[in-house]
A protein has these predicted regions:
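Cysteine-centered functional microenvironments
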Residues: 18-21, 55-61, 254-260, 374, ...
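Generic structural signal for well-ordered beta-strand positions
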Residues: 83, 255, 396-399
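Short acidic, glycine/serine/threonine-rich loops at helix termini
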Residues: 1-3, 26-32, 60-66, 71, ...
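Active-site cavity-forming subdomains of large catalytic enzyme subunits
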Residues: 48, 55-120
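C-terminal catalytic domains of large/alpha subunits in multi-subunit enzymes
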Residues: 7-16, 43-50, 78, 103-221, ...
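Conserved beta-alpha junction segments in alpha/beta enzyme cores
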Residues: 1-8, 105, 225-260, 265
Length: 522
């Protein structure tokens, strides 16, 4: 909102936004697109304005994930224990600076994340170009980071003759070793050892399936299993905050006011579940909870939907608002006041919940060294894709995708699973088909490589560990970014496992895979 207000010259308090249900936007609404244009037109014409983009405009007028060149080196002892990481990375952020500083920082926060690496020297540089403008996109900064470190650890494991799953497991975060995140502080919880324990039999079963398929193949189609580990933080860097209201109505229902932005991820269910878990103490049923959402006139500021912050930040705000209301309703004998009793006793019927991560102020991120403790909590995911590679055409198919994740207490399993199904399919597109380099070509959904339904594996297997997060509402972390932080290097690693050809650039379209296969013949 401040960007829009500044851009069209309107005081922030005079700007009202009412969000329509938008479906999946995956972060690009962090940057104003058509809203500011509409605002300028309204000011000039002094009448309601509608702006509809055609497909070409929708693709070219909106931001894209910033491409990056990741140059990563890893060192390990003779047993495979990681000792050091060195990096020199460059990000093409297009012509505008917005969020460029944050993107640069993300590469330092997530490159090598998930592993106990005591010595890290990782320099990242963001440059301006006349290419597509860079904006926020799901798992901001981590897909670039893990293209570096998750392929590098695979290369190192192969050189040392160590199974890539074993290499990752032996180096994961361990409380007994006091391992830290790349920014120098311990994670909120140590859950990776248990995550690898859950994933181990799934990985062994996948290796067996792949071996059986290769044994039965004539060699034209080769099969492989890949692995990667992704970690992503929940929240905006440093101190973050969100607010919500809970109001008891005359008919005994409760209205929740929340600006928990809905971008297809299920914000309405998030508000409902986060508030009902507390409101049910007063006998309030889910159908008695009304939602007023995403109108800046009636809802308090909840912050943006991004960085998987909403479940943690807005979920806590809804929880606190509900707790404050329930506390006011509760009588000394343990029963609860009605609306009429509240009014008769002069008690307020509307309460605010304000959640602030003040603890993040204790160790703010140093802009020069990237050291600090920026996030309330983290999400952890192990990716295990199984691929088939046609060695004559270079076509890669993801036949099965197994995913093992820990996103804390699961508040609504259907929504979490939906986030993971969608994110993994986006990862398939990122790894194999999607590109946006040629503005004379990549300006239709077909030409920019959006995957078809047939490109998505029918067999997606999800497993969740639920390690309680002390800073999350009822122990929950976020989940939105988790499935898209590192599925693509796992797919590229699976191509290597199948063929011995190492792909280090996305998308791994058939011509790129064929070129890598021909290199093996030299």
């Amino acid at each position: 909102m401040p960007m829009i207000a500044d851009g069209i010259g309107v005081p922030l308090e005079n700007l009202r936004l009412v969000q329509n249900h938008a479906g999946g936007t995956f972060g690009y609404k962090f940057s104003p697109t058509n809203e500011a244009l509409i605002g300028a037109a309204v000011k000039i014409l002094e009448r309601p304005v509608s702006l509809v983009f055609n497909q070409f405009q929708n693709i070219t007028y909106t931001g894209k994930r910033s491409p990056a060149f990741m140059n990563i080196k890893l060192a390990a002892d003779e047993n495979g224990k990681l000792l050091a990481l060195w990096g020199n990375n460059y990000v093409d952020h297009g012509p505008y600076s917005e969020f460029g500083d944050l993107l640069t920082m993300r590469l330092s926060q997530f490159t090598g994340a998930g592993y106990g690496i005591n010595s890290i020297r990782n320099k990242s540089t963001t440059v301006f170009t006349n290419h597509a403008w860079g904006s926020a996109f799901r798992a901001y900064g981590s897909p670039q980071s893990y293209m570096g470190s998750e392929i590098a650890i695979d290369v190192l494991a192969a050189k040392m003759g160590i199974d890539p799953f074993d290499m990752r497991e032996m180096n994961c975060y361990k409380e007994s070793e006091g391992t830290t995140i790349p920014t120098g502080y311990p994670p909120e919880v140590y859950c990776e050892e248990a995550l690898f324990k859950t994933a181990r039999p799934l990985y062994e079963a996948a290796k067996k399936r792949v071996a059986e398929k290769n044994a039965a193949s004539d060699g034209k189609i080769k099969y492989g299993i890949g692995v990667s580990l992704g970690v992503y933080g929940c929240g905006l860097d440093g101190v973050d905050t969100s607010n919500a209201f809970a109001e008891l109505n005359p008919d005994g229902t409760v209205t929740m006011y929340a600006a928990w932005e809905d971008h297809g991820q299920g914000a309405d269910m998030g508000v409902l579940v986060s508030s009902h878990e507390t409101l049910r103490q007063a006998g309030i049923r889910p159908e008695q909870i009304k939602l007023v959402m995403n109108d800046t006139k009636t809802c308090p500021n909840a912050g943006p939907a991004g960085g998987s912050r909403s479940q943690v930040m807005s979920g806590n705000a809804c929880r606190l608002a509900a707790e404050n209301l329930v506390a006011a309703m509760k009588k000394e004998d343990g029963t609860f006041r009605t609306y009429d009793e509240m009014v008769a006793e002069g008690l307020e019927t509307k309460y605010e919940g304000n959640w602030v991560t003040t603890f993040c102020a204790d160790h703010p991120i140093d802009q020069d060294t990237a050291q600090g403790d920026p996030f309330a909590t983290y999400m952890y995911t192990i990716f295990l894709p199984e691929v088939a590679v046609n060695t004559e055409t270079g076509k890669v198919t993801v036949e099965k995708f197994t995913c093992v994740a820990d996103v804390g207490t699961i508040m609504n399993r259907l929504l979490v699973e939906g986030n993971f199904y969608g994110g993994l399919v986006q990862g398939v597109g990122l790894a194999l088909t999607e590109d946006f380099e040629d503005l004379n070509h990549d300006t239709t959904l077909k030409n920019c490589g959006i995957p078809y339904p047939k490109d998505a594996p029918d067999d997606i297997e999800l497993h969740f560990n639920e390690t309680y997060r002390p800073s999350g509402p009822y122990g929950a972390a976020g989940c939105g970014e988790a499935p898209l932080d590192a599925p693509h290097p796992a797919i590229l690693n699976a191509i290597y496992n199948a063929t011995g050809a190492r792909i280090t650039r996305v998308p791994a379209r058939p011509e790129r895979v064929l070129a890598a296969l021909k290199e093996l013949e030299k």
